[in-house]
A protein has these predicted regions:
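Gly/Ala-rich beta-loop-alpha elbow adjacent to hydrolase catalytic centers
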Residues: 12-20
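Short alpha-helix in the alpha/beta-hydrolase fold that links the catalytic acid
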Residues: 113, 127-138
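Helix-loop "lid/cap" segments that line or gate small-molecule binding pockets
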Residues: 52-56, 66-78, 94-95
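Conserved acidic catalytic loop of the alpha/beta-hydrolase fold
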Residues: 1-8
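Catalytic histidine-centered segment of alpha/beta-hydrolase-like enzymes
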Residues: 124-125, 141-151
Length: 151
């Protein structure tokens, strides 16, 4: 319902939000809006948490992914396996250690790019409250009380 499609709009979900953010930063072409859906936001997590995630992934990828998919689901979710793309260890490492930069967000605003962030209060993947607090000074934040990571 909120995803907009257009020539001057960049959007991304979860890890894809990091990719969309970097694309908007690096783009020489016109960008009017950046939409971030449940952006991967782990910069408030400690190093131990991140190391454990990577260790569990390396030890048993299938069990890690099964647990991850279970955490994605909420009451309204049907099957999500068809939409899931397995990532690599390197991608998980990038996702966990990515730092959203206030300076980069300010740069996007200076370029005239409107930023929208969509978060679910019941998200079991990221700390959506921390993400809301971080993004609210740079973006219009939509915080859905009854939604999880999949919104």
């Amino acid at each position: 319902d909120y995803l907009e499609i257009g020539d001057f709009i960049i959007s991304g979900f979860s890890y894809g939000a990091i990719k969309a953010f970097n694309q908007a930063l690096e783009s020489k072409a016109r960008v009017d809006k950046l939409q971030l859906f449940s952006p991967a936001f782990f910069q408030t997590k400690d190093e131990k948490f991140k190391r454990m995630q990577l260790m569990f992934f390396k030890k048993d990828e299938d069990a890690y992914i099964k647990n991850f998919l279970e955490n994605l689901k909420d009451k309204s979710t049907k099957s999500i396996e068809n939409f899931f793309k397995k990532g690599s260890f390197q991608e998980l490492n990038e996702l966990l250690n990515f730092k959203w930069s206030k300076e980069d967000l300010e740069e996007l605003i200076k370029k005239g790019i409107k930023i929208e962030v969509f978060l679910g209060q019941n998200d079991k993947i990221i700390d959506s409250l921390d993400a809301k607090e971080f993004f609210k000074e740079f973006a219009t934040v939509y915080y859905f009380k009854d939604k999880g990571h999949l919104l």
